[in-house]
Amino acid sequence: MKHLFKLDPAKNLPHNSVTRLIHSGTDGFIIGGTDNLQTEAVENLYELLAETDLPIFLEVSDESMILPEAEHFLIPVVLNTENSKWTHGLHKELIKEMGEFIPWKRVTSEGYVILNKDAKVAQLTEAKTDLTEEDIIAYARLAENIFRLPIFYIEYSGMYGNPEVAKKVSAALDDTKFWYGGGIRSKEQAAEMAEYADTIIVGNIIYEDIEKALETTTVFAKKTV
């Protein structure tokens, strides 16, 4: 997967955009958000995407994001927080309550590093965002070599990140996949981050300018003679 659209169930999609997003050339969708999450809204959004055979990932930030019919679940582990609630605390409580019924083969964990101090998700998780490049690379190596996480996700959440950081993170990882999300608002930015990240995540621009959002998939289009 090179490209994923991230959809927030608490936001209204632009009119007639779902079919265009599905047929844009993206590799799949993440459904996830930070606040005002309701199971009904998650179900409605999931059903809107039902016509696609592309993977739909539910990013489980609370219980409202859990739909039994979903095929793929992403479990965020926030690495750059000192509040254990977001590294394993909530996870343990959910497993304690539902562990017997969790479809583990459909679950993928992702190591998150949140780097925009003004983002809601940074404030919610008490993320320490004033990190050096060395800090970020250390988190990448921690995710891969200590926690054995399959995904390392740098999240700038609405702000475009530093391509040089992405380049160094990419070089530090061998097997763990590097996902980048945050502030991609043009095909040029998509191409720049895609040079280093295994997967780029495009979110906010969907709600701001659907045409520019759709253009971000074109950087992966196969060239024909």
Swiss-Prot record:
Mg(2+) binds at residues 8, 34. It catalyses: sn-glycerol 1-phosphate + all-trans-heptaprenyl diphosphate = 3-heptaprenyl-sn-glycero-1-phosphate + diphosphate. GO terms for molecular function: heptaprenylglyceryl phosphate synthase activity; magnesium ion binding. InterPro entries: GGGP/HepGP_synthase_I (IPR039074), GGGP/HepGP_synthase_sf (IPR038597), GGGP_HepGP_synthase (IPR008205). GO terms for biological process: glycerophospholipid biosynthetic process. Its EC number is 2.5.1.n9. CDD domains: PcrB_like. Sn-glycerol 1-phosphate binds at residues 6, 153-158, 183, 203-204. Pathway: Membrane lipid metabolism; glycerophospholipid metabolism. Its cofactor is Mg(2+). Keywords: Lipid biosynthesis, Lipid metabolism, Magnesium, Metal-binding, Phospholipid biosynthesis, Phospholipid metabolism, Transferase. The keyword Lipid biosynthesis applies. It holds the Pfam family PcrB. Belongs to the GGGP/HepGP synthase family. Group I subfamily. HAMAP family: GGGP_HepGP_synthase. NCBIfam families: GGGP-family, PRK04169.1-3. Homodimer. Prenyltransferase that catalyzes in vivo the transfer of the heptaprenyl moiety of heptaprenyl pyrophosphate (HepPP; 35 carbon atoms) to the C3 hydroxyl of sn-glycerol-1-phosphate (G1P), producing heptaprenylglyceryl phosphate (HepGP). This reaction is an ether-bond-formation step in the biosynthesis of archaea-type G1P-based membrane lipids found in Bacillales. This is Heptaprenylglyceryl phosphate synthase. The lineage of its organism: Bacteria, Bacillati, Bacillota, Bacilli, Bacillales.
